[in-house]
Regions:
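Cytoplasmic-side transmembrane-helix entry/capping segments in multi-pass membrane proteins
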Residues: 55-61, 86-90, 111-121, 146, ...
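Structural signature of hydrophobic alpha-helical transmembrane segments
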Residues: 25-36, 81-94, 139-151
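Short, structured motif recognition centered on aromatic/hydrophobic residues
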Residues: 59-63, 70-76, 145, 149, ...
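C-terminal ends of transmembrane helices
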Residues: 40-50, 73, 98-111, 156-166
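The first (N-terminal) embedded transmembrane alpha-helix
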Residues: 29-42, 60-63
């Protein structure tokens, strides 16, 4: 049994030992929390288009930015859901909702940032989900599934709550294929 270093601490793993450079770990952490904020803004923007009140903004932002990780952590069933044990995730999701509530995002630049930001965040979160599954000793296919669920689960929950068909089921957004690819790369 090896040790995986994750977020500055050692975590048991089945077959290997990974040491993470502090700079890489910092960049990864910054990217992760930036993704939570961005997905909170995207969710809040979608709530604005539907005319939701502030409670709707908060819920849609939370589903968008935290739902996939929550699904992953519940399915892995090893400890507290990360978004609940690390409050900065909730703060960033709610901050994204507030930003979207008071700042109007629209136009081609926003559409571009939203589509490409979603794809980049999805890839990052796929890697996060796959690595977390590996950390807990899950087999290959469940590791890939946890990567995909982490990357796409939040947008699926958001879309279902909003009464829409989940965009990952044919909206031509590049999220599932990069999620599978990055999950495979990190296994």
């Amino acid at each position: 049994m090896g040790v995986l270093i994750a977020q500055g601490r050692a975590v048991k793993s089945n077959n290997y030992m990974v040491e993470v450079d502090p700079l890489i770990e910092s960049l990864y952490r910054w990217s992760d929390i930036s993704g939570v904020l961005l997905m909170g803004i995207i969710g809040g923007t979608m709530a604005r288009k539907r005319g939701y009140d502030i409670i709707g903004f908060f819920f849609i932002a939370m589903f968008s930015s935290l739902g996939g990780g929550m699904v992953r952590d519940v399915l892995i069933n090893r400890g507290t859901v990360a978004a609940m044990s690390q409050p900065e995730y909730l703060y960033l999701a709610f901050t994204g909702a507030l930003i979207a509530r008071f700042v109007y995002f629209k136009g081609k630049t926003w559409d571009y940032l939203q589509a490409h930001g979603d794809a980049v965040v999805s890839g990052l979160w796929a890697a996060t989900g796959a690595v977390k599954a590996i950390t807990y000793g899950l087999p290959l296919i469940p590791c890939i599934m946890m990567g995909v669920f982490t990357a796409t689960g939040g947008s699926m929950i958001r879309d279902i709550v909003m009464g829409r068909e989940p965009s990952v089921f044919g909206d031509n957004q590049p999220t599932v294929i990069p999620a599978v690819a990055l999950s495979l790369i990190h296994i």
